[in-house]
């Protein structure tokens, strides 16, 4: 069963105390801005639940290390485990490593999400919404700017081992396939691995070709910011280029407030973090949980960005 839950609903359902429980978590990597916000929020939330012991470890973007971490955490006798998976194609291996210990995947969708047993669940946001919201808003902005007869641009992918990156890029092509947006053409797409620095280098390389372009779509804010930094360093007027991304991080909103960033999509770190802990507690107590719990994405533009300050 799939369930969509608002953050307000999750906050309302917050547990203030539990019978003594231990939950362990492993994250793909600590060195990631958005995941840091997610992790910090989870530590804070868990700390407010009496009787709950919560620990988290860094997989350093190493799948083998993460699988060992899952096994080690299980061996410690925890009541449940939360996993932000390194490689979304390795769901079966991670699920097997957890054994009979209740498991909740958070943020990144494992490839075995449709085969999870009753003791496992997935809490995140529906990635079909993320790339679609961003790309469609850029499409509308291009039309409003008089570029509806033809617009060319670039697509920056996240890690190709990550389901979110694959889906967000597919979303872009699905939007371009719509009658309203089929005037958009992708000149080139490459991965910048969610990284601001890699995106800056990639954008600099693209610009060196001398191709004219009207938009840049990125799978996350960090890459969008890197692209913007490269364009500004080259002396481009950001009013001439539409840039869209995903996350609505605080850094991204600062860039948007400066007039350099056009579109992002709020990915609710609080909703995903609290939702994953709540699901882990329920599974640890033998309660049933929906196999997929989705926290909605929300479109963010300069007009409504004030509603999202300090949220991620």
Task: Give the residues covered by each predicted segment.
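A residue-level marker of the well-folded mature domains of exported/periplasmic proteins
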Residues: 18-312
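Gram-negative bacterial Sec-dependent N-terminal signal peptides
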Residues: 1-20
């Amino acid at each position: 069963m799939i369930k969509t839950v608002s953050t307000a609903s999750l906050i309302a359902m917050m547990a203030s105390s539990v019978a003594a429980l231990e939950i362990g978590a492993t994250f793909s990597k600590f060195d990631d801005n958005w995941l840091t916000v997610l992790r910090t929020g989870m530590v804070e939330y868990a700390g407010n639940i009496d009787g709950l012991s919560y620990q988290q470890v860094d997989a350093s973007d190493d799948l083998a290390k993460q699988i060992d971490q899952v096994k080690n955490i299980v061996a410690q006798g925890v009541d449940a485990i939360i996993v932000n998976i390194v490689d979304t194609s390795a769901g079966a291996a991670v699920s097997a490593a957890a054994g009979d210990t209740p498991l909740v995947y958070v943020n990144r969708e494992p490839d075995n999400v449709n085969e999870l047993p009753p003791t496992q669940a997935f809490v995140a946001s529906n990635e079909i919404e993320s790339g679609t919201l961003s790309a469609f808003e850029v499409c509308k902005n291009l039309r409003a700017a008089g570029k509806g007869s033809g617009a060319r641009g670039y697509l920056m992918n996240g890690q190709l081992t990550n389901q979110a990156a694959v889906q967000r890029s597919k979303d872009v092509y699905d939007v371009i396939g719509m009658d309203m947006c089929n005037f958009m053409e992708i000149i080139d797409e490459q991965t910048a691995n969610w990284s601001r620095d890699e995106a800056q280098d990639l954008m600099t390389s693209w610009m060196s070709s001398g191709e004219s372009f009207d938009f840049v779509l990125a799978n996350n804010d960090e890459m969008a910011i890197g692209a913007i930094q490269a364009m500004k360093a080259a002396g481009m007027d950001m009013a001439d280029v539409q840039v869209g991304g995903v996350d609505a991080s605080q850094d991204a909103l600062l860039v948007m407030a400066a007039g350099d960033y056009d579109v992002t999509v709020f990915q609710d770190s609080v909703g995903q973090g609290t939702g994953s802990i709540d699901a882990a507690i329920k599974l640890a107590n033998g309660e049933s949980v929906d196999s997929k719990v989705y926290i909605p994405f929300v479109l963010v533009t300069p007009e409504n960005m004030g509603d999202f300050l300090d949220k991620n």
